Swiss-Prot record:
UniProt keyword Ion transport, yes or no: no
Similarity comment text for this entry: Belongs to the SUA5 family. TsaC subfamily.
Name under which the protein is recorded: Threonylcarbamoyl-AMP synthase
Domain YrdC-like: start-end pairs: 4-185
GO molecular function: ATP binding; double-stranded RNA binding; L-threonylcarbamoyladenylate synthase; tRNA binding
Entry keywords, A to Z: ATP-binding, Cytoplasm, Nucleotide-binding, Nucleotidyltransferase, Transferase, tRNA processing
Localization annotation: Cytoplasm
Amino acid sequence: MVSSFRVQQAAREIRAGAVIAYPTEAVWGLGCDPWNEDAVYRLLALKSRPVDKGLILIADNIRQFDFLFEDFPEDWIDRMGSTWPGPNTWLVPHQDLLPEWVTGQHDTVALRVSDHPVVRELCALVGPLISTSCNPGGRPAAKTRLRVEQYFHGQLDLVLGGALGGRKNPSVIRNLATGEVVRPG
């Protein structure tokens, strides 16, 4: 169990521009403040991930994404809400409301409301976060804290402990407008 003090410490670090590792539902994640360009580019460099691929935003609850939903049909919001919190990621139109270092070359952004207690507590404190698997490009995602340390020894600002959520697969990714499954879970 992760103490609230450690989660609050992680929140302070994120607000100050940190890149952190933390447990998620299936694998360890890397995250940072999506509005902090330097932090996002540092995260991308750690992963050797090109900016044009775009990144996932995670949140504590659907309301943290309200700024994106102003012109959305109500059934879209209901569709997402019926699958959250949980292992469902939706590609939604971002309407140029997010920076390109988050969206990449896409006109959509990937959103998920996590059901992992550590992630939810962290997002409740700081708002939506960038979330990507904790691994350098081409390597398997970290499933243990030891693997996180082996991959990124000394390069992360904080490693927030805790247990993985027990899922075996990453979240399913669907296009909200079409319903198409982009990545099975």
